[in-house]
Amino acid sequence: MAKIQFSRGLDEVVIPEVRLTRSRTGDSGTATFIFTNPKILDQGSTEDITGMYLSDEEGEIITREVKAKFVNGKPEALEALYVMKSAQEWDRFMRFMERYAEENDLGLSKAEK
């Protein structure tokens, strides 16, 4: 099962908006995840955000690049950035996203030029 966590053991139920960029050569890319009002930011949550963990049957992809966005002093969103430095990392990430998308009924749309 493909899942996203910000604190180990606590699955995030909010589905993110994901934006992908890839170099022309295909050997690097970035994925930006935007979670609006994620569960981890609920008032009752006492868990620390230690990174973003993308887990599936192949293993785990980890990024520590997680930032909170605040509106009127209250956390409203999380933005996580995952940088891929090789074609292999890109392929692994895409396999995770295919599983995650299938399990959460998500689709892929290309940006307008």
From Swiss-Prot:
Assembly: Part of the photosystem II complex.
Name under which the protein is recorded: Photosystem II reaction center Psb28 protein
NCBIfam families: PS_II_psb28 (TIGR03047)
Alphabetical list of PANTHER family matching this protein: PHOTOSYSTEM II REACTION CENTER PSB28 PROTEIN, CHLOROPLASTIC (PTHR34963:SF2), PTHR34963
Topological category with respect to the lipid bilayer: Peripheral membrane protein
Organism phylogeny: Bacteria, Bacillati, Cyanobacteriota, Cyanophyceae, Nostocales
Alphabetized UniProt keyword annotations: Membrane, Photosynthesis, Photosystem II, Thylakoid
Superkingdom, natural source: Bacteria
Provenance organism: Nostoc punctiforme (strain ATCC 29133 / PCC 73102)
Family per record: Belongs to the Psb28 family.
Annotated Pfam families: Psb28
Localisation per UniProt entry: Cellular thylakoid membrane
Any one GO CC term of the record: plasma membrane-derived thylakoid membrane
GO biological process entries: photosynthesis
InterPro entries: Psb28_c1_sf (IPR038676), PSII_Psb28_class-1 (IPR005610)
Chief location: membrane
